[in-house]
Amino acid sequence: MDSYLPKSYPSLMEGKKILYVHGFLSAGSTHTADVLRQFMPRATVLAPDLPVHPADAMALLKETVESERPDLIIGTSMGGMYTEMLYGFDRICVNPAFEMGATMSEHQMMGKQTFQNPRQDGVQEIIVTKALVKEYREMTEHCFSQVTAEEQQRVFGLFGDEDPIVHTYDLFLQHYPQAIHFHGEHRLVEKAIYHYIIPIVRWIDDRQTGRNRPSVLIHWDTLADAYGQPRSSLHKAYE
């Protein structure tokens, strides 16, 4: 697998704060947060461990955004669901689990579960009960409750075209216009961050700083062969 970590963008989000909101059974120590730090070495990436109970997690996130005032919030899966509700900030929701209760019931997330990443509190396992699933169902009822025209311009949704777990693209699009599919699954890997997250972060950073970048538009026909297939030059430009 190609590694994209040697590539970094020191000026991207320089001096700014990014809040990363992890997914279910993950933690702030997730590799995704480390990748964001390596791509943007002069930005501060905050990645707190979230409490298991959604009301507690949402309270922690609201306290965090009030005290830290992040310039950008990025959330994945369950974290994408929470991120949508952190109104007043620029946000990127990746494979957001807006139907978290149903997702937990349908994808073997009941009973004893092990955290995928180390937590600061040392907890390694939890028991997912019907009561906890009900808490998540109730939390997701608050999604999209404060969508305005201004919020619609501040939120981006990214959805893996091969995601076997979360399918909320159409639901997101009912409330926010800036939604795209990317080639990938549910878990956010380095390649997806490099090709899809970083360009959106750059656009947000430019908008925040009032920067206008020169653009060169290349028509698809110039990069396709006689059979309509991509030339090697297209692959090189993409990579």
Stretches with model-predicted labels:
Residues 90-220:
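The alpha/beta-hydrolase serine catalytic core
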